[in-house]
Amino acid sequence: MFIGYQGIDVLPVQRAIHALRTTVYPSLQPQPATWKANNLPSSQEATGRRRIAFVSTWFRNHSVGKLLLGVIEHLDRTKFHIEIYRCVHFLQLPDELTDAFRRVADTYTELPVDMDDALALLRREYIDVLIYPELGMDEWTLSLAHHRIAPVQCVFWGHPITTGNPVVDYFISSEYFVSDFFDSDDNPRDDKNDSADKKDSADTFIHHGTHFSEQVVLFRGLGTFFTQVPGSVI
């Protein structure tokens, strides 16, 4: 996890690590998954809401949890059905922040420790968008991310570098977190030409950086809401 703090382009290294992991563990080779438009869950057919799933170990009193809770609270529930899947392979007991995540989610599930069982559970849910708040802090979640579970798969800013993973489609972060890394002589950002580097909305823009295997989408702002847990240390 410390490779991101060396001041180098880590994409070749991350791709090599990803390839090595799939060589050592053939079960991590991604298996094809299909989604049929006429086979959606009844809840989505009734509400029209997208099923957005967050998968992480860190739905707890941890920096990732503190920065993510408010984000989930502020998502528009008329558009999104929010599902939280907590990985419990080495931190099984919940804490007060875990309970807060349980309250703000439409559904809360603790994933089986067995990887095959966890994959089967997730694929039964017909998730539209799968979001990993971070990838890089524990091997189990990294391994899970080798598999295609949803049509769209994203990673947030919790670990600030590319995954090098071909089945992670988008890296979602803040212009304040990664834009300086893109703004070099060989990859300039032209703020005068809005169509060349940005599109979508007033809140986000797409950045065509070369240091990420994912499509990079940056918030015009921090893209986080900090939650201070009573009695905890920031």
Which role does the model predict for each range below?
Residues 1-186, 200-234:
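Alpha-helical solenoid repeat scaffolds of the TPR/TPR-like class and their adjacent stem/linker regions
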